[in-house]
């Protein structure tokens, strides 16, 4: 049985609810086809919901403990996703509900990991010395699931009053109970997710700053006793959508899955608070490679924050010139990062180039150096050292290699001003020809001294002639002559 598309939140009592936060869940999910239920005393009467644990709810002193008890009953009866009232929704949870049979998340793998209480036996009731704490602020189950049933039975048969037990609600009916029940037997259908998905900032201040998807931010209202000011809460800056935005342009033709994974991982591992629009064009890959690529991009977009993937397929193999011309037009941002599907960016590549382009608005295009490798990127076989170059210098030197195209960062308006990629150049020289036209049109190309990319050298790449075997690789006489003709045409 799957998790129903229902969002449950509870607000009981006479205090003003944190509607600003609660509405984020309603607004993000109703348009995704979810039913949103805000459980109050009136809503329970309206729906005819009668708690089988009302005596325990009445006996529970802590208001958050009363909500803890109710959540178990609601999840057992209806199934769906429960989240606390002090949680701010940033992304709809559709992907998680469709992927997992049931799930919850850790409280924090650093602060509340195994042994978080030291060697004391004070918290043995919540398995503190042997297991990390599992949070109850976000949980999802199908209806009538065994774990919520066991929680209800435990609460029914045990004393949960703090005055008599000396144990707060989090230990008896909240995270402590979930942690005990989860580790009390093997659950093949329950996944415990990383804490950062719903608790990116722990109450202690321990924060997650990576690029994995974050669905919500917890305000810890009960712990901080801050519900009275909850409707004034704003997301911290590093959780808000970035104002800096770039497009990343990538094309592929039957690229190996392991290379694509390395490429995508290097995007996910980028430093900086930057929104990435990824334009990925499939230039005629076969059926199985297309299926693999689409699945990898789907998983990447749904597990990475501050990213949008725009995928397009050509009708057959149109060639790199056609594909990149199309890709430039598709980019919605002025700053475009070029990348090959088989390469690996260094972690601060985009931040370095974006900072440079922002400081130098007159620069149309900038590249950087590459570290070449064959199988393991740590085993570098060569590093380039391209300097800056002007059009006047170029006319004297007539170089065939003066910028590393996979490291290029250019302004869309300047690429279009120079005429964009030539659609008729199918393989090999399309990058060189555009670089020449941009150099002539704008007068200067900046080559940063930084290594920005690990460049994979392998037999299948275009540079080695894998797509032009009758004409050889980039250094064959055929392509040397082609480039010389391009140079002469532009100079003369």
Predicted segments with their positions:
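Short, well-formed alpha-helical segments that are part of the catalytic scaffolds
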Residues: 15-26, 255-269
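Short, flexible, basic/aromatic active-site loop/helix in glycosyltransferases
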Residues: 117-125, 369, 382-401
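A conserved acidic beta->alpha catalytic loop
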Residues: 43-44, 282-293, 316, 340
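Glycosyltransferase-associated regions of secretory-pathway enzymes
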Residues: 1-67, 83-240, 355, 487-490
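Conserved donor NDP-sugar-binding/catalytic core segment of glycosyltransferases
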Residues: 348-381
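Short aromatic/hydrophobic "clamp" motif used to bind/position activated sugar donors
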Residues: 80-82, 336
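Conserved nucleotide-sugar donor-binding catalytic segment
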Residues: 250, 391-475
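Glycine-rich, basic loop-to-helix element that forms the pyrophosphate-binding segment
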Residues: 66-71, 313-331
């Amino acid at each position: 049985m799957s998790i129903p598309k229902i969002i449950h939140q509870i607000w009981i009592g006479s205090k003003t609810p944190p509607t600003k936060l609660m509405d984020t869940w309603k607004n993000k999910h109703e348009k995704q086809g979810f039913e949103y239920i805000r459980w109050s005393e009136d809503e329970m009467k309206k729906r005819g919901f009668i708690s089988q644990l009302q005596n325990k709810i009445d006996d529970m002193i802590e208001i958050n403990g009363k909500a803890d008890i109710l959540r178990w009953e609601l999840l057992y009866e209806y199934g769906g996703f429960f989240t606390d009232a002090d949680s701010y929704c940033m992304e709809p949870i559709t992907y998680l509900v469709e992927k997992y049979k049931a799930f919850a998340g850790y409280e924090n793998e650093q602060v509340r990991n195994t042994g978080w209480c030291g060697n004391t036996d004070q918290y043995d009731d919540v398995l503190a010395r042997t297991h990390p704490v599992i949070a109850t602020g976000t949980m999802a189950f199908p209806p009538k699931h065994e774990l919520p049933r066991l929680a209800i039975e435990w609460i029914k048969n045990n004393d949960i009053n703090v005055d008599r037990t000396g144990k707060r609600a989090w230990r008896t009916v909240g995270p402590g109970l979930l942690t005990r029940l989860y580790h009390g037997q093997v659950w093949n259908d329950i996944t415990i997710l990383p804490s950062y998905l719903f608790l990116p900032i722990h109450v202690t201040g321990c924060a997650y700053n990576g690029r994995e998807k974050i669905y919500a931010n917890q305000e810890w209202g009960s712990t901080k006793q801050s519900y009275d000011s909850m409707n004034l809460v704003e997301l911290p800056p590093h959780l808000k959508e970035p104002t800096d935005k770039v497009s990343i342009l990538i094309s592929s033709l039957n690229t190996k899955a392991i290379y694509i994974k390395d490429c995508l991982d290097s995007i996910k591992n980028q430093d900086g608070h930057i929104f990435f629009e990824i334009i990925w064009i499939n230039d005629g890959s076969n059926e199985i490679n297309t299926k693999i690529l689409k699945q990898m991009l789907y998983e990447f977009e749904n597990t990475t924050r501050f990213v949008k993937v725009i995928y397009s397929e050509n009708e057959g193999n149109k060639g790199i010139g056609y594909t990149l011309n199309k890709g430039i037009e598709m980019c919605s941002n002025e700053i475009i990062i070029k990348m090959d599907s088989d390469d690996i960016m260094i972690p601060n590549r985009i931040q370095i180039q974006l900072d440079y382009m922002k400081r130098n608005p007159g620069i149309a295009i900038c590249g950087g150096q590459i570290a070449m490798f064959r199988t393991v990127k740590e085993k570098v076989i060569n590093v380039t050292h391209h300097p800056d170059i002007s059009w006047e210098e170029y006319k004297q030197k007539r170089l065939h290699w003066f910028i590393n195209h996979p490291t290029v960062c250019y302004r869309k308006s300047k690429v279009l001003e120079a005429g964009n990629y030539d659609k008729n150049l199918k393989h090999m020289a399309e990058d060189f020809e555009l670089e020449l036209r941009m150099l002539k049109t704008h007068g200067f190309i900046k080559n940063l001294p930084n290594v920005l990319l690990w460049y994979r050298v392998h037999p299948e790449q275009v540079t080695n002639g894998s797509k032009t075997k009758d004409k050889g690789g980039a250094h064959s006489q055929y392509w040397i002559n082609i480039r010389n003709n391009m140079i002469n045409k532009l100079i003369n």
